[in-house]
Structures are given as C-alpha cells and as structure tokens.
UniProtKB/Swiss-Prot annotation:
Belongs to the YbaB/EbfC family. The keyword Zinc-finger does not apply. Binds to DNA and alters its conformation. May be involved in regulation of gene expression, nucleoid organization and DNA protection. This is Nucleoid-associated protein SynRCC307_0025. Gene3D superfamilies: Nucleoid-associated protein YbaB-like domain (3.30.1310.10). Keywords: Cytoplasm, DNA-binding.
C-alpha cells in the first residue's frame, strides 16, 4: 500500500485515536460551557445578567432603585449588562476552544 500514497496502518490508527480524543474533549468542553454562569453588570452595578459559557441567558437581576429611575435608564443598564455578559462569555468560549484546538493547527480554530 505504501506505493499508493496512503499512510501506514499505525499512522491511521493514531489519527483515529486522536480524532476520538478530540471528540471526547469537545463534548466535555460543551458540558463545561453549559454549566458555567458568567455575570455581566452595568457600570453602576444596578443591572446584572448571567449567561452560560454558550451564551444562553440564565438570570437577570435589576435593583429596585434602577426600576424606580424609569424605563429609559432601566433599558440602558440592562443592555449594558447584557453586552458585558456576552463579551465575557464569548471570550471564555474562544479561550477554551483555543485550549482544545491549540495543537491541531486547524484554520480558524486557534493554534
């Protein structure tokens, strides 16, 4: 088979083992990201939003004094908290994906 440009059986076996390990690691990472709770807050701390590591909304907390300050202020603080939580969540996901794929030299996936 060596004359056909195919890898030897040992190389092929190693490639399959590596692919299986990557699949297991990716599943574990997915579970870890799902279990994470990442908090983003408005600058004044009166609005907080929690997202998972996969950017799924989990909780919202709005301080009573924020609600009393009116609709516009409440909307602005809520949006600020959401943007903060999203930025932290996506950065965490990217960092963890780069850890997983760092040694693979896959285009667009870190490393």
């Amino acid at each position: 088979m060596a004359g056909f440009g195919l890898p030897n059986f040992g190389q092929l076996t190693e490639a399959f083992k590596k692919a299986q390990q990557i699949q297991q690691d990716a599943q574990k990472l997915q579970e870890e990201l799902d279990a994470m709770e990442i908090e983003g807050s408005s600058v004044d701390g009166k609005a907080s939003i929690w997202l998972s590591g996969n950017q799924q909304p989990l909780r919202v907390r709005l301080a009573p004094e924020l609600l009393a300050s009116g609709q516009e202020a409440t909307e602005a603080a809520t949006l600020e908290a959401l943007q903060n939580a999203y930025a932290q969540s996506t950065a965490t996901m990217k960092e963890r994906m780069e850890e997983l794929t760092g040694g693979l030299n896959l285009p667009g996936l870190g490393g």
